[in-house]
């Protein structure tokens, strides 16, 4: 048996390619839209993908299961568990609790593990050539390293009301009946790692075991003791802000993501062709680092720095449901522009049409900033903290309103437009993304706090802190 994890740090997301080397067949589980990655991995190992499945209707990225099945001719398997609200809107072989997928000598057994979502399946993997006992458990967003999947996303991002409580109770039962009953040696391979918003305390190692979670996780003693009430309270308390693009992902992944197929070549624009069009009939994505962006900002351009969180920050800055204008990215080459287009498609942003390699000649200027020492001189300023709610509670500038960077583009009406707005995060990275969004949406006076919260504290200022806040987190972006 070949077991090949395919992990992406941007989305903190894990996919899996599992193959039977005796027959040359393979199955992909929880694939992203970059189908070529999975096809190349299979070919590298002398395998062909004959089956594709996923653990649940994802909220944080656009599923690539349908795309990969279409590209390879593989059979697509989908959960048919859960209530009528969460049935897939496209065709696939239906899976239920106990259903089996066979790939050569490999057997995947579906285990219905509701809680994170009603239709959620996990997969026990057995290498039938050597044993009849499962050795791997693909848990999707059911169990992570050190944590479990949050049950509140249908409320937070999909418009449902109070499903979190029932979801938490279902998760308790799934852990009791389907996880803790497994042998300690079973390896657990989850759908996400540290950095994902699908849980609140995900570990940074790629996998764990049933036995390790039984001994070390916060939840196992509560489940073993039958203490559902304490489990529900602990699980729901302190969950991070759910990015609002999750609602769009849920909706499109349920209905059926659009098939990308063969994508057209990107057009190379000259800077002069963009003059007067930025934030008019097209979106310009400034992908430089924050320092260069602040030194030479094109009015109306959005800021999404090229790097390991490109797809994530892109989904924060752009809502394709509300803005269908074509996107031009700033890139050093056509190859880099194609990489950016592919990454943005992972969160359903499919309207990148071209790229520009320079901003020379475009109207540009420095981003307005204010030093911590000069903050009081900005009359009637609204301080905007774009860190998450837990960071804000742990310590914030007096009078600052909190709106997570992932929500600014979707809830900008909550930010006053009749006075100066001073944006900050922990160290400045997220603030630059959020400030550019507000400027593009028409806010006249948006400034960034130089060095953000870290610099303000370093200048000797005392933050306010919620009475029940945990200890402040370490400095970060």
Which residues make up each language-model segment?
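Divalent metal-coordination and catalytic microenvironments
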Residues: 18, 30, 56, 68, ...
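Conserved beta-strand hairpin/beta-sheet module of binuclear metal-dependent hydrolase folds
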Residues: 1-48, 69, 123-140, 145-146
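Active-site metal-binding loops of divalent metal-dependent hydrolases
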Residues: 31-32, 57, 81-82, 117, ...
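Short internal beta-strands
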Residues: 50-53, 75-81, 329-330, 355
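Metallo-beta-lactamase
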Residues: 23-24, 36, 40, 44, 50-59, 107, 117-239, 424, ...
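Rhodanese-like catalytic fold shared by cysteine-dependent sulfurtransferases
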Residues: 88-89, 150-152, 164-165, 212-258, ...
């Amino acid at each position: 048996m070949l077991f090949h994890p395919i992990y992406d740090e941007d989305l903190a997301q894990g996919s899996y390619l599992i193959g039977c080397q005796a027959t040359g067949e393979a199955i992909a589980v929880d694939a992203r839209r970059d189908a070529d990655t999975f096809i190349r991995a299979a070919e590298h190992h002398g395998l062909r993908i004959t089956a594709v499945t996923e653990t649940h209707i994802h909220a944080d990225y656009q599923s690539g299961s349908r795309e990969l099945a279409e590209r390879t001719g593989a059979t697509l398997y989908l959960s048919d568990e859960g209530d009528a609200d969460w049935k897939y809107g496209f065709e696939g072989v239906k899976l239920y609790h106990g259903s089996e997928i066979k790939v050569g000598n490999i057997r995947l057994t579906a285990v219905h593990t509701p809680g994170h979502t009603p239709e959620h399946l996990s997969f026990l993997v057995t290498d039938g050539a050597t044993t009849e006992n499962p050795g791997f458990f693909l848990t999707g967003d059911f169990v992570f390293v050190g944590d479990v999947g949050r049950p509140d996303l249908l409320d937070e991002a999909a418009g449902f009301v109070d499903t979190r409580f029932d979801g938490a109770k279902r998760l308790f039962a799934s852990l009791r009946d389907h996880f803790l009953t497994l042998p300690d040696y079973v390896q657990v391979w989850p759908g996400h790692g540290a950095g994902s918003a699908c849980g609140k305390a995900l570990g940074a190692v790629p996998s764990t075991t049933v036995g390790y979670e039984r001994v070390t996780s916060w939840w196992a003693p509560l489940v073993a003791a039958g203490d559902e009430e304490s489990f529900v309270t602990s699980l729901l308390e302190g969950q991070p802000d759910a990015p609002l693009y999750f609602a769009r992902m849920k909706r499109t992944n349920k209905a059926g993501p659009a098939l990308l197929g063969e994508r057209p070549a990107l057009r190379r624009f000259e800077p002069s062709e963009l003059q007067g069009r930025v934030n008019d009939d097209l979106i310009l994505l400034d992908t430089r680092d924050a320092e260069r962006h602040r030194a030479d900002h094109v009015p109306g351009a959005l800021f999404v720095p090229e790097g390991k969180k490109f797809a994530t920050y892109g989904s924060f800055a752009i809502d394709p449901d509300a803005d269908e204008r074509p996107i031009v990215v700033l890139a050093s080459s056509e190859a880099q522009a194609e990489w950016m287009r592919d990454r943005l498609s992972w969160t359903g942003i499919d309207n990148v049409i071209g790229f520009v390699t320079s901003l020379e000649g475009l109207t540009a200027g420095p981003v307005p900033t204010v030093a911590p020492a000069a903050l009081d001189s900005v009359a009637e300023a609204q301080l905007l903290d774009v860190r998450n709610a837990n960071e804000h509670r742990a310590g914030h500038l007096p009078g600052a309103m909190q709106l997570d960077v992932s929500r600014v583009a979707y809830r900008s009406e909550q930010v006053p437009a009749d006075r100066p707005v001073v944006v900050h995060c922990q160290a400045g990275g997220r603030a630059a993304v959020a400030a550019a969004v507000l400027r593009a949406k028409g806010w006249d006076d948006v400034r960034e706090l130089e060095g953000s919260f870290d610099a303000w504290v370093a200048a000797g200022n005392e933050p306010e802190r919620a009475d029940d806040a945990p200890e402040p987190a370490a400095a970060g972006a």
